[in-house]
Structures are given as C-alpha cells and as structure tokens.
Regions:
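Membrane-embedded beta-strands that build the outer-membrane beta-barrel scaffold
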Residues: 1-11, 45-53, 61-69, 157-163, ...
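Outer membrane beta-barrel strand-and-loop segments of large Gram-negative receptors
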Residues: 6, 10-55, 116, 144-148
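C-terminal beta-signal and terminal closure region of outer-membrane beta-barrel proteins
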Residues: 34-42, 87-113, 119-124, 198-200, ...
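Short sequence motifs at beta-strands and strand-loop junctions characteristic
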Residues: 37-43, 149-154, 221, 227-236, ...
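Extracytoplasmic gating/loop element in the C-terminal half of outer-membrane beta-barrel translocons
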Residues: 177-263
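Conserved small-residue
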Residues: 35-38, 52-151, 270
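Outer-membrane beta-barrel and related beta-rich outer-membrane complex signature
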Residues: 17-21, 61, 69-89, 179-207, ...
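Flexible, solvent-exposed coil segments and beta strand-coil junctions
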Residues: 21-32, 44, 134-142, 212-226, ...
Length: 303
C-alpha cells in the first residue's frame, strides 16, 4: 500500500551497573569496593511511518518519518535507600573541585546540578547573585539543586523525502531532537569582561559578555549557574541532493546521472552556542570544532 509503518513500546531494565559502595569495617582493605549494584530503567515508544502521497507516470513522492519518545532514570545506585545519595560527575572549565552533574535515583543520567541564578526586574542576570535555597544566609554547596534537566532528549526523530519527475530526482534527509539540555561551558568561562581585560583581549569579548554585562570577577559559584543551561532542541538538515539522469545520448545505450549535493545544510535551534549536538554523553559544551558544510558534484555512468 501507499502507507505503512510500525509502533513499538519498550521497557529495558539494565542491572549490575558498577559503583563504589561502602563496606563494613574490617571486611575489606579499603572502606569502599567497586561492585555490580546499580540499576537503570529505560522506557519509551518508537514509531516509523512511510507513505507515497503521489505516484503517477511522471511524478513520484515518498516521505519517511521515524521518532522515539524516551525516558531514562536510575532506579538503584547503592546498597542503602538514602534519598540524597548521589554520584557527582563531569567537571567544567572554571571552578575548583566541584562537578556539574549527578547520577541520582529517580533522575536521568548526567542530570545538571546547578545554582539558581537571580535576575533583575528587566530579566538580566545579576553577577554573583544566586538563590539561597537552604536559607542559611550564605551561598554554599547546599544551595545547588537537581534541575531535572539532562542532555538526554525526550524525543528524537528523522525525516526523509524522495521526489522524482521524469528524469529529475530530488531528496533530503534530516534529524533532530527535543528536550535535550546543554550546559554552555564556553559561555560560563567567558561570561565576564574581567577575564578578557586581564588577558589583554579587550577587543575580543565573548558575545555573552555584552549580554550579561558582567564586569567583576565571577565567584566560584557563578560558574555553575543555571543561566548557562540551555534548551538545545534542534533540527538539522543533513543532506540535500538534486540529480538528472540521461537515459540515451545519441547511439549510446547506457545511462548517465549527474547530481549536486550539500551535506550539513542548516540547523534550526535556539541554542546560543556553536552547535547543539555535543559529542559525548554529558552535554557540556566547552566549544567544539564546527561541522563543515560539504558540496559535491557526482557523475554516475552505467554501460
């Protein structure tokens, strides 16, 4: 038929994840031991749809779409039920000794663990002003909070299209995601003019300096502010191709196809950094090499 597809629901339980756990006194040479104890649950819905809206003698159009809704969280990390137990991971450029993310039961892997930024009445961040969440009169590690945001997308998808008219053909492929968050570490490390002035780089301010207006030295806590946490949902047009096939050239019985293509055509996103697709698993953007856009001209000959 002209329409076909499938839908699958999945539930995957991963057990025996490695973690260091505290051992009883005298039972081991150290006070912790690496053991298989953690568990993680991954569930979601996958679907794909292919349909042919146009099919005539001269015209053919085929469209494909696939997507996955997913939810991942830890269900066990150690041998106790302590609700505040967490494994801290992932360092950033600035700050000393503090890690940006946590693995914690009930949360997705690499959930961001940040300070909450304070803003003025115009919505601009106030430098070194963070919310005293534990109400102890000072800003300390107890004021950081689990943001419930992670680099793991809630939904990711792909789309393809193929269109032909007589000897012409056109097609594209794209993909994207929604609900994935990136910590803009480059922005965090370059958010104040104080750094650039001291480095002798006055003409080369990061764009964020103009946006924040920060002029003093950042506090150790400011580097971990949730103001640098950004929704990195995106759509990327991976490639576009246009071709023409010559079925007969004079007395020659072969065929020849000429095609022009572009890869990494464009990206649609609200993320302010260079690229919303961050290599690795932790979603921390310390400034990556840009992906090149490639143009190609292809010639295929069949004898």
């Amino acid at each position: 038929g002209r329409i076909n597809g499938s839908v699958d629901w999945y539930l995957r339980q991963t057990d025996d994840l490695l973690n260091n756990v505290i051992t009883p006194m005298g039972s081991n040479f150290g006070n912790t031991v690496l053991t298989n104890i953690g568990s993680m649950e991954n569930k979601g819905v996958e679907f794909n749809l292919n349909f042919i809206p146009v099919q005539t003698k001269d015209w053919n159009l085929t469209v494909g779409f696939n997507g996955t809704f997913q939810h991942t969280e830890f269900t066990k990390l150690n041998n106790t039920d302590a609700p505040d137990y967490a494994i801290q991971v992932s360092s950033i450029t600035k700050g000393t000794g503090n890690l940006l993310q946590r693995h914690m039961v009930g949360y997705a892997p690499y959930t961001y663990y940040c300070f909450q930024q304070v803003y003025d009445q115009d919505g601009k961040p106030i430098q070194n002003a963070l919310v005293d969440r534990n109400k102890n009169g000072q800003i300390d590690q107890g004021d950081r909070y689990m943001t419930d945001k992670s680099p793991n997308p809630d939904f990711f998808y792909g789309i393809s299209l193929k269109l032909s008219y007589k000897n012409w053909d056109f097609g594209f492929n794209g993909h994207g995601s929604a609900g994935n968050w990136v910590f803009n570490d480059f922005a965090s490390a370059n958010s104040t003019s104080n750094i650039d002035i001291n480095a002798g780089n006055l003409p080369n301010f990061a764009r964020l300096v103009k946006k924040t207006g920060f002029t003093k030295a950042n506090s150790g806590e400011q580097w971990y502010s949730d103001m640098f946490l950004e929704n990195a949902s995106f759509f990327r047009m991976d490639d576009i191709n246009l071709g023409y096939t010559f079925n007969k050239i004079g007395n020659w019985k072969g065929s020849m196809r000429v095609a022009f293509g572009v890869q990494n055509v464009f990206v649609i996103t609200d993320y302010s950094g260079g690229d919303p697709e961050i290599p690795g698993v932790n979603g921390i953007d310390g400034s990556i090499w840009p992906r090149p856009r490639t143009y190609s001209l292809r010639l295929n000959v069949n004898f």
